[in-house]
């Protein structure tokens, strides 16, 4: 769907109404025990024709999203250069009134600056219109203010930035108002400092981990000897989703301090990126929450039918928003050396892999887009 059409859909709360339990725009809070039992390792279906929705895109072991708040234009070139070198995409949560009112564009950026980042493949999301939250002498925003802060910020981004779909919010100061936010956003980032267990993501107030090795290794490996010490026992984080938050990287009163802070951030990001090919899916925030909610609500049925495998993949999410492909691992018949696939008659991305001598296909399929047929090349 074109950006303008999606933006129009998001401009009214009615677009986020759920009908008879289907076409959901976000999932409710997870039950106490989680939505499912998280597999401790990669899953390998045993019999030809069997299939499984991978926990993360590309069958990665875990997930990490790097987010940047508060506009911070002075860092844009630094982030663009580093992310391009490392082959990763980032998510900016933007305070939009600064752009609408052209407040201090040297720090807050202009729409042209955000378009530049979107054109490079990064995600531009909302940190509300004005970052208002209760603190010190500032009162809690009224419900009317919150509706405007959430709705108008998403609309401003979608009206001014193409090649991008603003559908997520980072709560100012981590102050959540999920009932109101759910009328406009598919997910919101909180700031409580723990990565997300894969089976228990609260999509309307996600956790926020840290960029240090302790947090990263707990999701990527399920264990760590790095600090903080308290995280070392949180085995439920294995295969989870770590959401990293940065503000101004080049912060400090003098050049030496600014350089030191930037070097520290660069080392953290480089370590995360070093795990991206197999252990981590380094995902834009909106891609991760689309994948997660599609996966959490998906139904998969597959069967071997003669010389082909067919499967259907459905979910409970709103189809014109939740369009990120899920990775479906399909056990192929013995002897297959390659595979190709179509969904609804159109070719889809397939990667052939083997495990313990058995052939598999990793098929990228979008829920509710038709039957998927897998055949040998």
Which residues are covered by each model-predicted region?
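Bacterial N-terminal signal peptides
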Residues: 7-17
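Boundary at the C-terminal end of the N-terminal hydrophobic targeting segment
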Residues: 17-20, 172
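N-terminal pre-catalytic segment of deacetylase/amide-hydrolase enzymes
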Residues: 21-65, 107, 285
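Metal-dependent polysaccharide deacetylase catalytic core of the NodB/CE4 family, i.e.
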Residues: 25-36, 74, 84-186, 192-212, ...
């Amino acid at each position: 769907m074109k950006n303008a059409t999606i933006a129009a859909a998001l401009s009214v709360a009615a677009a986020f109404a759920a009908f008879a339990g289907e076409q959901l725009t976000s999932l409710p809070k997870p039950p106490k025990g989680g939505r499912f039992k998280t597999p401790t390792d990669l899953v390998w279906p045993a019999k030809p024709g069997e299939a499984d929705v991978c926990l993360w895109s590309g069958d990665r072991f875990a997930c990490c999203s790097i987010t940047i708040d508060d506009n911070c234009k002075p860092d844009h070139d630094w982030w663009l250069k580093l992310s391009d070198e490392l082959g990763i995409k980032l998510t900016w949560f933007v305070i939009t009134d600064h752009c609408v009112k052209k407040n201090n564009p040297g720090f807050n950026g202009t729409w042209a600056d955000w378009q530049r980042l979107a054109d490079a493949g990064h995600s531009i999301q909302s940190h509300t219109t004005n970052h208002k939250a209760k603190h010190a002498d500032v009162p809690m925003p009224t419900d009317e203010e919150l509706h405007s802060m959430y709705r108008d910020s998403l609309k401003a981004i979608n009206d001014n930035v193409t090649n991008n779909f603003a559908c997520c919010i980072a709560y100012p100061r981590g102050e959540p108002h999920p009932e109101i936010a759910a009328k406009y956003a598919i997910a919101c980032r909180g700031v409580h400092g723990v990565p997300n267990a894969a089976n228990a993501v609260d999509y309307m107030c996600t956790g926020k981990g840290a960029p240090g090795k302790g947090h990263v290794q707990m999701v990527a490996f399920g264990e760590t000897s790095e600090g903080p010490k308290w995280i070392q026992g949180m085995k439920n984080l294995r295969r989870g989703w770590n959401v990293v938050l940065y503000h101004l990287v080049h912060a400090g009163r003098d050049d030496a301090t600014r350089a030191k802070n930037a070097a520290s951030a660069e080392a953290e990001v480089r370590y995360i990126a070093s795990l991206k090919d197999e252990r981590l899916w380094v995902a834009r925030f909106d891609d991760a929450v689309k994948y997660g909610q599609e996966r959490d609500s998906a139904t998969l049925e597959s069967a071997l039918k003669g010389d082909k495998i067919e499967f259907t993949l459905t979910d409970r999410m709103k189809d014109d928003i939740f369009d990120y492909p899920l990775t479906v691992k399909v056990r192929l018949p013995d002897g297959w050396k390659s595979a190709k696939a179509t969904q609804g008659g159109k070719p889809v991305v397939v990667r052939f892999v083997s495990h313990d001598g058995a052939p598999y296909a990793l098929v990228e399929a979008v829920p509710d887009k038709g039957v998927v047929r897998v055949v040998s090349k």
